[in-house]
C-alpha cells in the first residue's frame, strides 16, 4: 500500500525525522490559509499523486509550456494561483502512463535553502536477506538512470537485523553521502530513525529523494515515498486509515476483496494463472511472441468457483483487453473448478474477445470436457507455448 508524500512526512516526523513545515490542501480555497500558516517567503506547491516524476510532469488541460506538478511560489498570491491551476487537473508523468492522474490534493510546503541534494532509500535486499540502505550523492534525479549510467555512485549498506543501525553503519553512510560536520551528526541521528520507522511500520520501501543538506549544514527530508507490506497491514490500523483508494486501480481494489493477486499492466492480453511463478512465465512468453500482458493475475492454489468467476469478470472489465489466456496447472487447484468458474463468468458478462485455455494437471480432462460441452467459443491449447502463440495470433488477427 502506498501513501501520499505529506502523509509519509507526517509519519517520519512522528519518529523524529527533520521535515519541512507543510499543510495539505484539498480545495483551492484552502491554499491562502495554508500558505499564511507557514514561515515563507518561499513556498513549494506539490501535487499529491501516487507517482514519481511530478516536477517534470505536464497537466493535460494546460498548455505544453505550463509548469509541472511541483512548483516554487514566491508569495501567498502565487501559491493561490498555482493551486487554482493544479487542483482538479490531470497530471501526466513518466510513471502515470498517458492517462495521467487527477490531482485532488496539494501539499503547500515551506521553502528550503538547498546546498546539496542526496538520495536515500531503505528496502528489502533479497540478495543478502537483509534490510539495506541504498544511497547516492546524486539526489533529486532518476535513481534508475544513475544506477544504469554510473553504478559506482549508488552505494548499498546492509543492516544486521540483530544489531540495527550501528556506529559503523552510520560511518559508512556518511562516507557514501560525503557528509561531515553538522550534516554527519544529523546523519547519525536520522539513519536509525528511518530504520526504526521502516521496521516498526512494516514498510516495504522508504525513499527520500531528495534528502538535502541545507546551506546551514543541516539535513532535511525534502520528499518521502513510503510503501507498506500489504500482508502486515492488519497490524497497523493507523496506516490503513491513510489509504487513498482514488489513487488505486479499481480492478486491483476489486481483486483484493477476493484475495486475488492482481496487478494492472499496459498490454492487451488478459491473463488468469495459478501460481506467481507460472503467471510470470506466462507474461514472459506473451512478450516473447510480440504482445503485451494486460495484467498479472494469480488466482492461487485453492480458489473456489466464485473466486475464479470474480477473476474473469475483473479481466473483462478492462477495455484494453483484446484477448484472454487462461493457463492452469492443476495441483491443489482443480482444473474443473477453473472451467466452471469461467463458464459462470462468461454466462454473466458475455465473451467478446478471443479466449485461449490451457489446462494441465488435476482433473484437466474433466475441465476440458466442461468447457467443450459449454458451447463457448474457446480455443484449447496443448501447452504454454501453444497457448501463447494462439492468443497472440488471435489478438493480432
Swiss-Prot record:
Keywords carried by this UniProt record: ATP-binding, Ligase, Magnesium, Metal-binding, Nucleotide-binding, Tricarboxylic acid cycle
GO cellular component terms attached to this protein's record: cytosol; succinate-CoA ligase complex
EC numbers on record: 6.2.1.5
Gene Ontology terms: biological process: succinyl-CoA metabolic process; tricarboxylic acid cycle
Broad class of enzyme this protein falls into: ligase
Domain ATP-grasp: 9-254
Pathway: Carbohydrate metabolism; tricarboxylic acid cycle; succinate from succinyl-CoA (ligase route): step 1/1
InterPro entries assigned to the protein according to its UniProt record, in alphabetical order: ATP-grasp (IPR011761), ATP-grasp_succ-CoA_synth-type (IPR013650), ATP_grasp_subdomain_1 (IPR013815), Succ-CoA_synthase_bsu_CS (IPR017866), SUCC_ACL_C (IPR005811), Succ_CoA_ligase-like_bsu (IPR005809), Succinyl-CoA_synth-like (IPR016102)
Cofactor: Mg(2+)
Gene3D superfamilies: ATP-grasp fold, A domain, ATP-grasp fold, B domain, Succinyl-CoA synthetase domains
Positions with a binding annotation for substrate: 274, 331-333
Cofactor binding comment, as recorded: Binds 1 Mg(2+) ion per subunit.
Family of the protein in this entry: Belongs to the succinate/malate CoA ligase beta subunit family.
Quaternary structure and partners: Heterotetramer of two alpha and two beta subunits.
Function: Succinyl-CoA synthetase functions in the citric acid cycle (TCA), coupling the hydrolysis of succinyl-CoA to the synthesis of either ATP or GTP and thus represents the only step of substrate-level phosphorylation in the TCA. The beta subunit provides nucleotide specificity of the enzyme and binds the substrate succinate, while the binding sites for coenzyme A and phosphate are found in the alpha subunit.
Stated name of the protein: Succinate--CoA ligase [ADP-forming] subunit beta
Gene source species: Mesorhizobium japonicum (strain LMG 29417 / CECT 9101 / MAFF 303099) (Mesorhizobium loti (strain MAFF 303099))
